[in-house]
């Protein structure tokens, strides 16, 4: 189960790993909501996410 579940409240905060608003990841160190593109299990540390995806170069 994804601890960062925006579906229920529209916002979430996974400690220091992720902060989301309206199901868009505003910062991401680990997989959060729909921040990472398909096939990307987590974003690299410090990766900046835009809208609901991060650049594939951020993937680990």
Swiss-Prot record:
Residue positions binding a divalent metal cation 5: 33, 35-36, 49
Region (Alpha): 29-60
Keywords: Metal-binding, Metal-thiolate cluster
A Pfam entry, by short name: Metallothio
Coiled coil: none
Binding site for a divalent metal cation 2: 6, 12, 14, 25
PROSITE patterns: METALLOTHIONEIN_VRT
Residue sites binding a divalent metal cation 7 per the record: 49, 54, 58-59
Binding site for a divalent metal cation 4: 32-33, 43, 47
Binding site for a divalent metal cation 1: 4, 6, 20, 23
Domain of life assignment: Eukaryota
Keyword Kinase recorded: no
Gene Ontology MF annotations: metal ion binding
Binding site for a divalent metal cation 6: 36, 40, 43, 59
Binding-site list for a divalent metal cation 3: 14, 18, 23, 28
Region called Beta, residue ranges: 1-28
Task of the protein: Metallothioneins have a high content of cysteine residues that bind various heavy metals.
Family: Belongs to the metallothionein superfamily. Type 1 family.
Notes concerning its domains: Class I metallothioneins contain 2 metal-binding domains: four divalent ions are chelated within cluster A of the alpha domain and are coordinated via cysteinyl thiolate bridges to 11 cysteine ligands. Cluster B, the corresponding region within the beta domain, can ligate three divalent ions to 9 cysteines.
Protein name, as recorded: Metallothionein
Taxonomic source organism: Gadus morhua (Atlantic cod)
């Amino acid at each position: 189960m994804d601890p960062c579940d925006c579906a229920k409240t529209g916002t979430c905060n996974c400690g220091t790993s992720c902060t989301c608003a309206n199901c868009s990841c505003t910062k991401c160190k680990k997989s959060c909501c729909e921040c990472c593109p398909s096939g990307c299990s987590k974003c690299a540390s410090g990766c900046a996410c835009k809208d609901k995806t991060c650049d594939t170069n951020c993937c680990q």
